[in-house]
Structure formats: C-alpha cells, structure tokens
Amino acid sequence: MYLVDMTFTDMTKITPELTDKHKNYLEGEYKSNNLLFGGRKVPRTGGILISQHASKRELEQVLNSDPFIKSGAVTYSITEFIPLMASKAYQGIVA
C-alpha cells in the first residue's frame, strides 16, 4: 500500500478547471479500487492519497499523467507501507 503526499508548488495554476480535471482523472482509479482515499491537507498545501496499486511503478505512471502533475502545479512523494492495524470497517486491507 502507498501513501502519496502531494504538495502544491504553484498555486496560481490551481484553478477550478484544473481541479475538476484532476478529480475526473482520478475517478477511474477509485472505481477500480486502486485508490482508497484522497483529500486535501489542512491547511490547503496539497493533498493525500492512499493507494493499493499493484506496484510503485504503476502508481507513478498514474500520478505522472494526473493533470495536477502535468501542469507543474503539484509535486508528489510516495511512501510504501504495510498496514498492520485497522478499525473493524477496514480489516480486509490489513496484512
């Protein structure tokens, strides 16, 4: 599993139109269950995604095609982790 930390690097590029393109692009990844969660950081300096893509390379390919990344408005870092504990609602994803 992966935690993706996205950071805004150019707020002037973060328009409602670009944000809609980003959300629409990622929608397919949620439908295929590759992305589990995503949302804004507080304060709004970027966002976080929780991914269960098959590999880091596959996740990187998805991220590099994201309109946020392609526009140069956002950078990202990926941390791989193994979930060992979860609430009852999420026991199915714990190793």
Language-model features: locations:
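Conserved, structured core segments of small domains
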Residues: 1-95
